[in-house]
Swiss-Prot record:
Binding residues annotated for K(+), in chain numbering: 116
Pfam families: Pan_kinase
Entry-linked SUPFAM superfamilies: Actin-like ATPase domain (SSF53067)
Swiss-Prot/TrEMBL keywords: ATP-binding, Coenzyme A biosynthesis, Cytoplasm, Kinase, Metal-binding, Nucleotide-binding, Potassium, Transferase
Protein location: Cytoplasm
Organism (species): Azobacteroides pseudotrichonymphae genomovar. CFP2
Annotated protein name in UniProt: Type III pantothenate kinase
Location (main, coarse): cytoplasm
Cofactor: NH4(+); K(+)
């Protein structure tokens, strides 16, 4: 059994895999070492990988190294099953790469657009030759709502949850519809352009996908575990890579 860990800006997710099959998933906003220890003791995985968009405590890294026969902290020097065509690979988010790998292994030899809607929105492209070609980063829903409140004197801070009419009928719905409809049109344009120019298939993932998956058009594959699946593929690749040396 393998354990894969995706520590994002807001939520930490854990996936347990047997081969390529997802057996169980967990998530938390509060990272406690006792919680990790309980999972490791209960399921006794043999190998694991962790990627993080923020600093990881040394105590957690030590626990994982001591508990697993093989442990990899996913950094940009780790061998990958994709080629990277990006001018600053050291600054490239490992979560973006994991999502790209997860999509690639599901739809080999296709051009792929990978959209991850979380705290931030990332839009990445992998071509049919398995080359990651880069992408864009935009503000996620909460960041947009926070920005409207923070950078103005009178606009309230509101939640993503609630009515989203095509035209706001009060200040709250005007803000929410402006943000959420704006994201729909933004992502819809990306999907349409990549389908036309690259004949790309689109993957959607991320914690905020639920707000948009039914409102976007195109050839869409929604996979809430895409990053975890990609990390699992990267972990499997490490074992194959180092055995071949």
């Amino acid at each position: 059994m393998y354990i894969v860990i995706d520590q994002g800006n807001t939520i930490l997710k854990i996936g347990l895999f047997e081969g390529k099959a997802v057996i169980k998933t967990f998530q938390t906003k509060e990272v406690k070492q006792e919680w990790f220890y309980s999972i490791l003791k209960t399921y006794q995985p043999q190998a694991g990988i962790l990627c993080s968009t923020r600093e990881v405590s040394e105590s957690l890294l030590s626990l994982l190294r001591e508990s697993l026969s093989y442990f990899y902290e996913f950094k940009n020097n780790l061998p990958l099953p994709l080629s990277i065509d990006y001018q600053t690979p050291r600054t490239l988010g490992t979560d973006r790469l994991a999502a790209a790998v997860g999509a690639w292994y599901q739809k080999l030899n296709n051009n792929l657009l990978i959209i991850d809607i979380g705290t931030a929105i990332t839009i990445d492209f992998v071509n049919r030759k398995g080359i990651y070609k880069g992408g864009n980063i935009s503000l996620g829903p909460a960041m947009r709502l926070n920005a409207l409140h923070y950078f103005t004197n009178s606009l309230p801070l509101i939640s993503e949850n609630g009515n989203i009419p095509i035209r706001g009928y009060d200040t709250e719905t005007a803000i929410r519809s402006g943000v959420m409809e704006g994201i729909v049109h933004e992502l819809g344009s990306y999907i349409e352009e990549y389908e036309k120019k690259e004949n790309a298939l689109t993957f959607l993932t991320g914690g905020n996908t639920i707000y948009f998956e039914k409102r976007l058009k195109g050839t869409l594959f929604v996979d809430k575990h895409l990053v975890l699946k990609g990390l699992n593929e990267i972990l499997i690749y490490q074992k194959k890579f180092f055995k071949s040396k």
